[in-house]
Amino acid sequence: MRAAAHRNQRTFRKIGWLLVALLLSAGAWAMPQVTAIGPDLYAYISDNDGSANSTFLVGSKGILVVDTGVDATEGSKVLQEIRKVSQLPVLYVINTHYHPDHQGGNSVVGPNAAIISTDFTRERTLALMQSSPQLHLQAADVTFDQKIKIHLEPYLAEVYFPGKAHTSGDALVYFPRQHAIAMGDLFLNRSSPAMDDGSVENWVKALDQTLALPLDKVVPGHFELATKVELQRFRDYLSDLFTQVRSLYRSDVKVQDAVRRIHVEKYADFRQYPKYQATFADNAEVIYQQLQQQ
């Protein structure tokens, strides 16, 4: 019970910092990077670290968007870039998970779109809508348990739940024709991730499954567009840290000492965000807590 309470406090603190990011992002109108990563598929790399990347696919009759940014301002930036490519309506919005920085722009990007997420993401979003109405979130209209296919002619998007990983209800969006994937926060390019009520052990397995796909481009939840090379390194970081912490845990090393004894020198270029509990030490502590619950 104590570990669960501590985990929930961590989650609420992280969401609190996301609210701070929401406020800080208002009025920030720098230039994002938009890159074609396959036939009619585009990666939108946000210029705001507090707002997620997006991906959009243009079909013959409409557009599919993955993640919409932290708020209406960031959502407007996403929509502005979409409109440089196509004037077709946004038919589908997919939210990779419930954190506000990935879905705060839903109502701007796709006011008439069908919003799609896992069942878990919808439940958590509804709870946030009650506790934090100032976020103006919009929960999914369509939910799924394991997998859903979206036919946006002439293309296909495969949306699936890889198991508990970053959260307990993440969604990955694979575009088979384009050999590309939008990963939400299951992958951050050269950064320690924030860890929610998920499973790092399964997270590594999910990344292994992703790496087995035919992939040319990988859109991370935040930071630069990537390939399998960067995804492999992020996977290796999580696996390495998990192995180290598990060894210390099995040797009855206390959590405070375990956090101090990890070796992460080869990941020195990874970004660290203490305010989001997204540091090497934070990651090690969460892994330790997850091992305690097994």
Which residue ranges define each predicted feature?
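Bacterial N-terminal signal peptides that target proteins for export
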Residues: 3-18
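Accessory terminal helices/loops
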Residues: 19, 212-214, 225-294
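Divalent metal-coordination and catalytic microenvironments
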Residues: 40, 57, 67, 82, ...
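Active-site metal-binding motif and surrounding structural segment of the metallo-beta-lactamase
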Residues: 60-64, 73-116
